[in-house]
């Protein structure tokens, strides 16, 4: 209500959109270079550099563009630069551990990072988070590396039914380059996790 001359004037309110991220999600939300985790301040991180790439698709196979893909992971020694990691003070100061990329019109994303070490009690992995306009919640998943014996004992990997676990494992296309496609719905939907 608005007051006019001491009287309240009723005005019809226009409801906002249902998109949780908002109808005006930025067209440019990702800085150039935010998808390269291999160095901080021109100092190269420890460990083997790898590439992770993929395509994000809807249920019908349509690629999703302007979707924000974030990743976070441990450094080459399995340590996170985060206060919740009891050994975070020992983490590689040249490895930020977090990156962001936007999908192209073809739904493609790409990251350059370091092959993570295995954090205590876990298999080596990379965490993913997806955000875009119209998505009612942030989607989170985890990518595991192929051929790792520790996958079978990882609590997150084991939380997914056996028949769907392969959807969490990247495919190594050539040494050091991994493909991890993400599908938002349907029979081959990527398993997504709640907090």
Show where each model-derived region lies.
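Beta-strand-dominated extracellular/periplasmic modules and repeats
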Residues: 2-195
